[in-house]
C-alpha cells in the first residue's frame, strides 16, 4: 500500500522539514567512499572534498565489527571540522538488521544532520525498509530542528530488492536513488563469480562457425547489463538517480573505466570510487565527451524549439535526436559550473 497522493508530501513528524518534490540539481559523477575510523584518511578529507562531487563516510562493509563505533564517531568528528563547500555529504550506515544502525542514524542526525545530504541504506529489500527509515528520520529531524530533509539512497544487493524496485522507488519523497551492490547481489542470486563488478571471462557469446576458420571467436559480455538497465529505468521513471557501485579491482583501471562507461551510456548518473585512482576515472567517464557535446550543441542550434528536421554532417536530426542532444548539453552545463576546464572545452 502507498500513501494517497494528497498525503505523500506531508511531513511524518510534527516539526520535521517539508519533503522535497524534486532532487537538487548537482553533479554526482563520483561518490568517494572513505573509512572514518582511520585517522590518517580523516586528515585528508578536506583536500579530497575539493576533488569529488560526493563524499560518503562508510560505516558498513569493510569496517571491522570492533571499529563500528570508532567509524561513527570519526565520521561525526570530520564532518564537524570540515567545510565541504558544494561537495555533497553522504553516509552509508549499517544494515537495518544490525545492532549499530539505530545509533548510527540517531547520533549522526543529532550531531551533523544539518550538513548531511543523503543516508545510504544497505541491502534494501522492499518499501518497508524505506518506510521505517523515513519515519525514524522525520522524528529525529523534528527533535534536532534539522532544516532540510535528509534523503535516502537504497543500495541494491539482493534478488528481493531487485524484484521490489518499483515499490522501493515510490516509497517516500525522500528517495534519492539506487546504487548497484554487485558483490552481495551476485551472492544473493547465486552468480558464480568472486569479482566485485566487471565482466567475467566465461560469460559471453560464441560466434557462429565459419568455413575455414580454425577457432570460433568468443566475445566476453557484461554480467551487469540487465541489472543496470532495469535500475536506470525504474530510477528515471520515478525522478530518481541510478549509480554503478563499487569496482573492486583497484589496479585494473582499464576494466574499471570500461565498466563505468557502460553504466554511463546506459543512463547512470555516477559511480563509486574506492581509492584515489578511481576518482579521475569516474569524473572523466561520467562527464560527456567533448565532441559529443559540441555536436549536440549544433543540433540544438539548428532546431531551437525541437521541431522539424535538420541535416547535420549528412545525418538527419529530428525531435527524437533533439531530446538526446538536450540530455547531453544539459549535463554538460551542470558539470561546467563546477569544472572550469570542461566549461572551456564545451564552449559553455
From Swiss-Prot:
Protein species of origin: Chloroflexus aurantiacus
EC number assigned by the record: 4.1.3.24, 4.1.3.25
Name of the encoding gene: mcl
Role summary: Involved in the 3-hydroxypropionate cycle used for autotrophic carbon dioxide fixation, and in the glyoxylate assimilation cycle used to regenerate acetyl-CoA and produce pyruvate as universal precursor for biosynthesis. As a part of the 3-hydroxypropionate cycle, it catalyzes the cleavage of (S)-malyl-CoA to yield acetyl-CoA and glyoxylate. As part of the glyoxylate assimilation cycle, it catalyzes the condensation of glyoxylate with propionyl-CoA to yield (2R,3S)-beta-methylmalyl-CoA, and catalyzes the cleavage of (S)-citramalyl-CoA to yield acetyl-CoA and pyruvate.
Organism superkingdom: Bacteria
Protein name in UniProt: Malyl-CoA/beta-methylmalyl-CoA/citramalyl-CoA lyase
Annotated family: Belongs to the HpcH/HpaI aldolase family.
Annotated positions binding substrate: 32-33, 40, 92, 183-184, 274
Cofactor binding comment, as recorded: Divalent cations such as magnesium or manganese.
